[in-house]
Amino acid sequence: MITLYFVRHGQTVWNESGRYQGSTEVALSALGKEQAKLTAHWFEGIFLNGIISSSLGRAMETAKEIAKLKSMNVEVVDALQELHFGDWEGKTFEEIEHCWPGMIEEMYHHPELLQLPHGESFADLQRRTVQAVKEIINRGDN
């Protein structure tokens, strides 16, 4: 049986300021760096065959903390990147609500219907990431 552990990156400087980041490169905050180290320690007694991350720096930095503890390398799979929020990236909740009234509520209540302005749909995100996970599982290297 294959067991997959999905880990979210540590807090970023945009998380701190309430900004949407998606596919934009945003650094981990001081707290996020500490969270990455604590997450790595959670894996101390767990055997891992591999560590896979998206290419976003915040995800890589978090994954590298686990890899360092396990003396392993991190494999990069671009398809695992976060949703591309398009025009929303870098904006706060308030800025988005001002520019696109009602869209945030729509995102939380009917994400399957939402197409982000100049961004990715949740259906596209799902297709991309599910395909990547299937490929990882099906390659047979445990």
Labelled PLM ranges:
Residues 1, 13, 60, 68-69, ...:
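Active-site-adjacent alpha-helix immediately C-terminal to a catalytic or transition-state-stabilizing loop
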Residues 1-5, 50:
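Extreme N-terminal starter segment of soluble prokaryotic enzymes
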Residues 6-10:
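Histidine-centered catalytic micro-motifs
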Residues 11-65, 115-130:
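Loop-to-helix element that buttresses phosphate recognition and phosphoryl-transfer chemistry
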Residues 16-19, 102-114:
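Short, basic/glycine-rich phosphate-binding loops at helix/coil junctions
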Residues 37-104:
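Phosphate-coordination/substrate-recognition cap region in phosphate-metabolizing enzymes
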